[in-house]
């Protein structure tokens, strides 16, 4: 199986502008390619893992990655289908860009990667040069036909967001001309921007050897966006989302989803994935595929030590042990892996559920209690008026609060 065929088998290729050329280039040559990440937040999310995996697979084949962090395009914002983006300040955009670059350098440790920030060149273009030298090459009708733009026309789209496509096209042109980049990689929602970049290269450089490849967007089986956990974004930054929450998310994916995730989000070879698929069909209750997926992802974005902490945390939380069976070292670990909330005085259980984010409101917290889904340690609490006091603690300070089977928080006096 050729490298291109492996990418197709992994469901990592959705669109390419010239399949014959892309296959030839990826299978038989060394290509310099780029993938862009806009710093709209302080961290990447698990939704970016598909691009990161693609970069690693391309590297393993000998191709050369250029990672573009969009310090300039992050100031503008890629148009959303539903509403106008809130503009970032220059300070926030550059700070986010620095954070994301650091995050990617950690994940791509010991790999040969070139990092660039488009603020370096886009910020140098004055408005007259922008309109004369580049704007005249973009046809308004062509831009209006792009999916996101077309969806926003009824509700309205600003010229700022409308111009984003041009800026990303200039990125591809700049990297093609100055860094010898021939291929752009991006999610399928970026395909319109990728093809615009190919077009501007053709018009300005009089060449048609640039190539573009898009990966599919991952959705959960219910159609929701991949990486959402009860309406919470799963960030790769451990200070924003605990590694254990990500561990739990992937450990609980369905048998229907897990094999596709193994293909798209890990470097596990085809033989290993097919073996896991067979074992899942034979003994789904063992969840061997989910465990392999989870271990691979936590190792990639965090470390093997953190993976072991997550495994140990899982053992503690699902042991169904009596309160007196917990050891103090268990809580020292849980302080690192769970959402931890400090209090100085007694607190109503209803308030504690909201403050630990196990409930979004007091009314929801009361419903959880009525439904018998709330436990202190492993004991169900049925009283709406229950007050958490220091007498409920272990080792004079710890309260383990549980909602259902999968949601936990630690309260510390």
From Swiss-Prot:
ATP binds at residue 228. GO terms for biological process: tyrosyl-tRNA aminoacylation. A motif ('KMSKS' region) lies at residues 225-229. Gene3D superfamilies: HUPs, RNA-binding S4 domain, Tyrosyl-Transfer RNA Synthetase. One of its GO terms (cellular component) is cytosol. It is found in: Cytoplasm. InterPro entries: aa-tRNA-synth_Ic, Rossmann-like_a/b/a_fold, S4_RNA-bd_sf, SYY-like_C, Tyr-tRNA-ligase, Tyr-tRNA-ligase_bac-type, Tyr-tRNA-ligase_bac_1. It is an enzyme of class 6 (ligase). Keywords: Aminoacyl-tRNA synthetase, ATP-binding, Cytoplasm, Ligase, Nucleotide-binding, Protein biosynthesis, RNA-binding. Its main location: cytoplasm. A motif ('HIGH' region) lies at residues 39-48. GO terms for molecular function: ATP binding; RNA binding; tyrosine-tRNA ligase activity. SUPFAM superfamilies: Alpha-L RNA-binding motif, Nucleotidylyl transferase. Pfam families: SYY_C-terminal (PF22421), tRNA-synt_1b (PF00579). Its EC number is 6.1.1.1. L-tyrosine binds at residues 34, 164, 168. PANTHER family: TYROSINE--TRNA LIGASE, MITOCHONDRIAL, TYROSYL-TRNA SYNTHETASE. Catalyzes the attachment of tyrosine to tRNA(Tyr) in a two-step reaction: tyrosine is first activated by ATP to form Tyr-AMP and then transferred to the acceptor end of tRNA(Tyr). HAMAP family: Tyr_tRNA_synth_type1. Belongs to the class-I aminoacyl-tRNA synthetase family. TyrS type 1 subfamily. This is Tyrosine--tRNA ligase. It comes from Aster yellows witches'-broom phytoplasma (strain AYWB). The gene is tyrS.
